[in-house]
């Protein structure tokens, strides 16, 4: 098995490390945090493909935040972050159980009730 996967996106190339996340599953680990060039280029490409009339963007914490922020800035709108745990500041949080391919145990995702009202 090759140790990396060559990703071509928005005119850029990145070599992603392959990681075994289960006995029968290997994924190419894609972490864009800190890759300003990749975030800005993909944000511009995605922005151009989005329809008019979007009110909010929603993203999971934390890896998607920079890309979502860059797209929202271009759209001139705000965005909402779905958290991985209930935070003390949340009002009437909306909690959903999920199963990720990168973790063995079930997790929860949490949307602040105030953000849920916006959406």
What residue ranges belong to the model's regions?
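Short, flexible loop segments at the rims of nucleotide/cofactor-binding pockets, characterized by
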Residues: 34-38, 58, 100-104
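Preference for short coil/turn "hinge" residues that link or interrupt alpha-helices
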Residues: 9, 20, 60, 102-107
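A generic local structural motif
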Residues: 43-46, 66-67, 107-114
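Short Gly/Thr/Asp-enriched flexible loops that form oxyanion-binding sites at enzyme active sites
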Residues: 66-75
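Short alpha-helix boundary/capping motifs
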Residues: 40, 61-62
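Short glycine-rich phosphate-binding loop at a beta-alpha junction
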Residues: 54-61
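Short, glycine/charge-rich flexible loops or terminal/linker lids adjacent to PRPP-binding catalytic cores
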Residues: 77-119
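Active-site-facing substrate-recognition patch
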Residues: 1-54, 115
């Amino acid at each position: 098995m090759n140790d990396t996967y060559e990703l071509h996106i928005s005119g850029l190339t990145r070599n992603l490390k392959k990681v075994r996340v289960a006995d029968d599953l290997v994924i190419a680990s894609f972490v864009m945090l800190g890759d300003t060039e990749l975030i800005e280029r993909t944000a511009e490409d995605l922005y151009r493909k989005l329809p008019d009339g979007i009110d909010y963007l929603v993203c999971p914490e934390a890896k998607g935040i920079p890309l979502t922020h860059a797209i929202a800035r271009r759209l001139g709108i705000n965005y909402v972050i779905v958290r991985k745990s209930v935070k003390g500041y949340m009002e009437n949080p909306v909690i959903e159980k999920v199963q990720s391919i990168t973790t063995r145990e079930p997790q929860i995702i949490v949307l602040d009730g105030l953000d849920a009202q916006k959406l």
